[in-house]
A protein has these predicted regions:
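Flexible helix-coil transition and linker loops at the boundaries of alpha-helical arrays
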Residues: 59-72
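Residue signature of alpha-solenoid helical repeat architecture, marking inter-repeat boundaries
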Residues: 27-28, 73
Length: 131
């Protein structure tokens, strides 16, 4: 009798947990993905951070005419953070593209500095062999 009661409680807990996870997975807000990407960066899980920042960019397309100020800022931040992650991975071409995108969206000193640092890094690196 006790075993059956424990089994029922365990089953209900599992079902409740499953439903919470399912509902939580449907939150496709750009802000959630931006926060998750930042968390992954803090933990050093860069591949997952890339996916999250790219999801922010996918969810807020620039062709969308009614983009809010907050979404515009999130989009610039996602490009900036993606550029930083790409530099950590040594993907300089991708980093420069994202840094330029972030500067185009938010022409701030920090975004400009990032573009210039990546360009300087590319100038200092040895030339790639031509195929």
């Amino acid at each position: 009798m006790l075993f059956k009661s424990i089994h029922n409680v365990t089953g209900r807990c599992f079902l409740s947990l499953f439903l919470l996870i399912l509902v939580g997975c449907k939150d496709d807000s750009p802000d959630r993905h931006l926060q998750l990407g930042n968390w992954y960066v803090q933990k050093g899980i860069l591949d997952e951070a890339v996916l999250e920042f790219r999801e922010v960019i996918r969810l807020i397309p620039l062709t969308y005419k009614d983009i809010s100020k907050e979404e515009f800022k999130m989009l610039g931040t996602a490009h900036y953070n993606l550029a930083l992650v790409y530099t950590k991975k040594g993907w300089w071409d991708f980093a420069l593209k994202e840094a330029q995108n972030s500067f185009n969206l938010q022409p701030t000193a920090s975004h400009y500095d990032l573009v210039q640092l990546i360009k300087k890094r590319e100038e200092l690196s040895p030339q790639k062999p031509q195929s």
